[in-house]
């Protein structure tokens, strides 16, 4: 049964707070098993990868090789429908152009004392991209993770992807080449994360790891963090649609189901001020559910985690939307643009009835790797900046040191750090 919350109910605040705190996935306690895998890969390298791949993916890497060859990628292009390849090229080009606008500029200036300050940006040298296998092996995710790295100037982009029973999604290989991925390895799970972090005889280590994965992959990313950087630990997908009665209920229902079909733990929320419209959308959802290939997944998601929130008016929707802090926020109301400046917390905002979130998934150009589970309150979607580092610059001459040095000495001595004070004083003959 879909959850319905009415703002006019006296216990609405209590129910809404409980709704916000609800968990959509059970965290498996896999840390001990994952730590054993990570430690073994760190010790044994390729030997451990071969063993785990036989056990978990039923593939003999001694026969296939760990690395995916150029010939295999060529074959993937031959197998891929030409229309799909063209669509992926369009997506790639739009992602590239949008992310190029995110490139930061170096800055250097001289202040009133003559001190030179500034910062410069450099790309991370090597990054690893984890791509899940099976039903979650999406070529669009390859583009979304790899293209910002390419735009940032990352020298080496390494992709790992499991090959259950020896099978790789050809479109994933196509997307990898289109995005400029440097190396591809047919390994997955926690063992692939460990290989990227520590290196093996075949796989050289990287400096940062990005990409989604299951509980084992997420645990491995947490374990290796510090040795390498990571992007985020993403949860199930979610959408909040704020819509008025002038929308076509079938359109809104389709958008809700586009999230629901991702995962049984995905969440689709409708927020409206019109109960009759809400009922019409719910009826449209039920009609459309039975037309989907992933009916079982979408039905479970909508039944267990779907929600309708009835507000008194759309002015009340804004603070509620900010508290939900949805990964995806669709605003389909008469003056959608007026809402946008007042939304503080959302991973990505889709403005107007002709901007379904699905366009953002594929060809809009914005990144679809976004914060979930209310983490949009404090974090952002993947961007070029995730593949870059900022280094501060500072330059003083003798005059500037004489002007600033005494204050530095004073603070150092107050903190009991004599060597700090001496580092400046010795230059000033103090």
Curated annotation (Swiss-Prot):
One of its GO terms (biological process) is L-histidine biosynthetic process. It holds the Pfam family Histidinol_dh. GO terms for cellular component: cytosol. This is Histidinol dehydrogenase. Belongs to the histidinol dehydrogenase family. NAD(+) binds at residues 130, 191, 214. Binds 1 zinc ion per subunit. Its EC number is 1.1.1.23. It comes from Brucella abortus (strain 2308). It catalyses: L-histidinol + 2 NAD(+) + H2O = L-histidine + 2 NADH + 3 H(+). NCBIfam families: hisD (TIGR00069). Its cofactor is Zn(2+). Catalyzes the sequential NAD-dependent oxidations of L-histidinol to L-histidinaldehyde and then to L-histidine. Pathway: Amino-acid biosynthesis; L-histidine biosynthesis; L-histidine from 5-phospho-alpha-D-ribose 1-diphosphate: step 9/9. Keywords: Amino-acid biosynthesis, Histidine biosynthesis, Metal-binding, NAD, Oxidoreductase, Zinc. The keyword Cytoplasm does not apply. PANTHER family: HISTIDINE BIOSYNTHESIS TRIFUNCTIONAL PROTEIN, HISTIDINOL DEHYDROGENASE HDH. The active site is at 327 (proton acceptor), 328 (proton acceptor). Zn(2+) binds at residues 259, 262, 361, 420. It comes from the Bacteria. The keyword Oxidoreductase applies.
């Amino acid at each position: 049964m879909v959850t319905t919350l009415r703002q006019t109910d006296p216990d609405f605040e209590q129910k809404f707070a409980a709704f916000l705190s609800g968990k959509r996935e059970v965290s498996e306690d896999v840390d001990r098993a994952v730590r054993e895998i990570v430690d073994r890969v760190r010790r044994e390298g390729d030997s451990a990868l071969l063993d785990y791949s036989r056990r978990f993916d039923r593939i003999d890497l001694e026969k296939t090789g760990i690395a995916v060859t150029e010939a295999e990628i060529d074959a993937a292009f031959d197998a891929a429908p030409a229309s799909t390849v063209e669509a992926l090229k369009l997506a790639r080009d739009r992602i590239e152009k949008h992310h190029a606008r995110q490139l930061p500029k170096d800055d250097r200036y001289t202040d009133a004392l003559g001190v030179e300050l500034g910062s410069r940006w450099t790309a991370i040298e090597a990054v690893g991209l984890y791509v899940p296998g099976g039903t979650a092996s999406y070529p669009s995710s390859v583009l979304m993770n790899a293209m910002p790295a390419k735009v940032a100037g990352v020298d080496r982009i390494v992709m790992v992807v499991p090959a259950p029973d020896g099978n790789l999604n050809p479109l994933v290989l196509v997307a990898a080449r289109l995005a400029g991925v440097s190396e591809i390895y047919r390994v997955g799970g926690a063992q692939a994360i460990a290989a990227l972090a520590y290196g093996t005889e075949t796989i050289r280590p990287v400096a940062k790891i990005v990409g989604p994965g299951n509980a084992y992959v997420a645990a491995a990313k947490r374990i290796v963090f510090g040795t390498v950087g990571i992007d985020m630990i993403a949860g199930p997908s979610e959408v909040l649609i704020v819509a008025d009665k002038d929308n076509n209920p079938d359109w809104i229902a389709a958008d809700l189901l586009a999230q629901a079909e991702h995962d049984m733990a995905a969440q689709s929320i409708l927020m409206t001020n019109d109960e009759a419209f809400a009922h019409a959308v719910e009826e449209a959802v039920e009609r459309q559910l039975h037309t989907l290939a992933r009916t079982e997944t979408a039905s479970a998601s909508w039944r267990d985690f779907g929600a309708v929130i009835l507000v008194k008016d759309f002015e009340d929707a804004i603070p509620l939307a900010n508290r939900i802090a949805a990964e995806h926020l669709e605003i389909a109301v008469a003056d959608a643009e007026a809402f946008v400046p007042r939304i503080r917390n959302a991973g990505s905002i889709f403005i107007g009835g002709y901007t379904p979130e699905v366009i953002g998934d594929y060809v809009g150009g914005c990144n679809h790797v976004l914060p979930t589970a209310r983490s949009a309150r404090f974090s952002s979607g993947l961007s070029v900046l995730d593949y870059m580092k900022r280094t501060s610059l500072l330059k003083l001459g003798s005059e500037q040191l004489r002007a600033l040095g005494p204050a530095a000495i004073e603070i150092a001595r107050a903190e009991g750090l004599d060597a700090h004070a001496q580092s400046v004083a010795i230059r000033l003959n103090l």
